[in-house]
């Protein structure tokens, strides 16, 4: 039986009584954001809106984006990535579970030195698929030229943000490449791997 989104008490500054809000709204107030689904236009717009709002509220406090995503549509994912580069606060990215496809692209887009994976997280990179917009029925299929441009864009970002040579990234993107947290760290996709049962990082 589904439990829905859990609610937690929250007391606004100056208020005597707490009100019940859903757990994600409470965490957003602490600048903790979550991508826990496929990347699509809806979640992309929500995360972009939150990042912009929280940046306006305080441009000096870092943002934290927790990722557990199998990937999704390229353009909404690139929009999240671009917003992360645009907003003044540093955006920490934290991989928990899986960051695959566009999930790994968003993960690598975190502030360099502030990208973390949990010990048993998995990361997967590959080239973009041929679906372009929000249709999976093949209604909107990328022309080969457009697909090539997208692949070049994604490859260039991975090269820039991992420090790996172009030929290494290009070769990896030819197929699905799955990595453990430590392999993702060695690959330059994350900077740190969390240590179990402690607050320390390696």
Swiss-Prot record:
The keyword Hydrolase applies. It is found in: Plastid, Chloroplast stroma. One of its GO terms (biological process) is protein quality control for misfolded or incompletely synthesized proteins. The keyword Chloroplast applies. InterPro entries: ClpP, ClpP/crotonase-like_dom_sf, ClpP/TepA, ClpP_His_AS, ClpP_Ser_AS. The active site is at residues 101, 126. Its EC number is 3.4.21.92. It is an enzyme of class 3 (hydrolase). Pfam families: CLP_protease (PF00574). GO terms for cellular component: chloroplast stroma; endopeptidase Clp complex. It catalyses: Hydrolysis of proteins to small peptides in the presence of ATP and magnesium. alpha-casein is the usual test substrate. In the absence of ATP, only oligopeptides shorter than five residues are hydrolyzed (such as succinyl-Leu-Tyr-|-NHMec, and Leu-Tyr-Leu-|-Tyr-Trp, in which cleavage of the -Tyr-|-Leu- and -Tyr-|-Trp bonds also occurs). Keywords: Chloroplast, Hydrolase, Plastid, Protease, Serine protease. GO terms for molecular function: ATP-dependent peptidase activity; ATPase binding; serine-type endopeptidase activity. HAMAP family: ClpP (MF_00444). Belongs to the peptidase S14 family. Cleaves peptides in various proteins in a process that requires ATP hydrolysis. Has a chymotrypsin-like activity. Plays a major role in the degradation of misfolded proteins. PANTHER family: ATP-DEPENDENT CLP PROTEASE PROTEOLYTIC SUBUNIT (PTHR10381), CHLOROPLASTIC ATP-DEPENDENT CLP PROTEASE PROTEOLYTIC SUBUNIT 1 (PTHR10381:SF15). Component of the chloroplastic Clp protease core complex. This is ATP-dependent Clp protease proteolytic subunit.
